[in-house]
Amino acid sequence: MNEMTHRTKTRPVKVGNLTIGGNNELIIQSMTTTKTHDVEATVAEIKRLEEAGCQVVRVAVPDERAADAIADIKKQINIPLVADIHFDYRLALKAIEGGIDKVRINPGNIGRRHKVEAVVNAAKERGIPIRIGVNAGSLERHILEKYGYPTADGMVESALHHIKILEDLDFHDIIVSMKASDVNLAIEAYEKAARAFDYPLHLGITESGTLFAGTVKSAAGLGAILSKGIGNTLRISLSADPVEEVKVARELLKSFGLASNAATLISCPTCGRIEIDLISIANEVEEYISTLQVPIKVAVLGCAVNGPGEAREADIGIAGARGEGLLFRKGQVVRKVPEETMVEELKKEIDVIAAEMAAEREKEKETQEQ
């Protein structure tokens, strides 16, 4: 059996101003829910996704109106834009002409070779990568006839078939996804894909469900895949506001130490010793830090006796008691604050530390560029 390709060893592929593959960073993606031809609504949703931490966004391109809107959308957003194309190669050509940063297709359903070749040549000319989207629910008939039902081996065979179509045209800026709604099937498919080729892998559990159920299902499946060193980019697919997809993705990556640009909240599960409204405070603080782009760790704990010691890895935190709270940094108490102002005091400290971290990161960046 071939050795599994770790995410750091995958082939680097440029998507807009980002590099996917060849490093340990995972890029968070989402997809718009608007009609793409409605430029104003689509841009507004993308702006919300950007603010939440989305790094790449995909739009459906089902018709010419959608393809024609790409150029206008691109002018108004700050993250790479991906066109989702099915069947009609002319829509891919229009999207590429409009300045799209990546195209998601299955070469096998675009049509005859000359159509695929036209898309590949246009993408190659503009330096645009292609994502091959393998889905357990839409495998080719001959593969289903061979295996009887969707299997990991069948999904990998489909991916290799599509990869070969592009490679035969001397095209190698390829990203591959192996999506399934069955968690175990998805895990097996991604493992086998990581052994079969070294192209970057886009992770996802498709049709995972509503906000609650889909979050659990995606975390279970993608967490198992991430823990094996597989995956270069991911989308949490939810029947919910796409901003929620980004929030879940950020939390998942933080759990594995794979998010260097996101804040983390540490909070206790509550018990009978608590004298403050810890749940509402934790929710308020979580919302406050949700858009921070620095790896600050913030703790909200209900016990002033054990709290600071239990969260000594936190950059800043509060531990509540009746009438007052302890503000602490790295496990050391800084000062006592009145209960009615302790959340505001915590927010002030968060702002200071976040600014320091951002300045330090900028300084490191300037040093590296010299």
Swiss-Prot record:
One example GO MF annotation: iron ion binding
NCBIfam families membership: ispG_gcpE, PRK00366.1
Pathways per UniProt: Isoprenoid biosynthesis; isopentenyl diphosphate biosynthesis via DXP pathway; isopentenyl diphosphate from 1-deoxy-D-xylulose 5-phosphate: step 5/6
Binding-site positions, [4Fe-4S] cluster: 268, 271, 303, 310
Name of the protein described by the UniProt record: 4-hydroxy-3-methylbut-2-en-1-yl diphosphate synthase (flavodoxin)
InterPro entries: Dihydropteroate_synth-like_sf, IspG_bac, IspG_bac-typ, NO2/SO3_Rdtase_4Fe4S_sf
Cofactor descriptive note: Binds 1 [4Fe-4S] cluster.
E.C. number: 1.17.7.3
Family, similarity comment: Belongs to the IspG family.
Enzyme class: oxidoreductase
Cofactor: [4Fe-4S] cluster
GO BP field: isopentenyl diphosphate biosynthetic process, methylerythritol 4-phosphate pathway; terpenoid biosynthetic process
Pfam families: GcpE
